Regions:
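Charge-biased low-complexity segments
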Residues: 6, 18-131
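Sec-dependent N-terminal signal peptides
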Residues: 4-13
């Protein structure tokens, strides 16, 4: 019994540490893009990230869910897209209840993108979605 409790404690601590590291990395990534882009609309990729067609229905479901759960007409979310086209970090522009934000984040994680490209190499990028 003691071993099970100890294992649970170790796993919980590991989860918290990883979550903090991921959060810090996300904040650093968003700060980097904020500094790079500022208020300007500039292209920093040869090919910017784009959503794959298979994610179109997921976006429609996201919009429907957001309309039912919030009072906002639309929600803007900045996402860091990794070099494989998977969203890894999320920043909501509006204030949203934590429970709703968690549900939206879970749904946003299912979206898939064609990654940005620089010199024929897939790279991490930022993408803003309106839901």
């Amino acid at each position: 019994m003691v071993k099970i409790i100890a294992l649970f404690c170790v796993l919980s601590i590991n989860l918290l540490v990883n979550a903090q590291v991921d959060t810090l990395k996300c904040e650093e990534s968003f700060t980097q893009y904020d500094n790079l882009l500022g208020e300007n609309l500039i292209a920093i990729w040869e090919t910017p990230p784009s959503m794959k067609e298979c994610s179109g229905q997921d976006v429609d479901r996201l919009k429907e869910f957001a309309r039912k759960q919030t009072s906002y007409e639309c929600i803007l979310v900045d996402m860091i897209i990794d070099s494989d086209g998977i969203p890894i970090c999320f920043r909501f522009k509006q204030q949203i209840e934590p429970v709703i934000k968690a549900k939206l984040t879970d749904k946003l994680k299912l979206l898939r993108f064609k990654p940005a490209i620089i010199v024929n190499k897939r790279v991490e990028s930022i993408y803003t979605i309106k839901i």
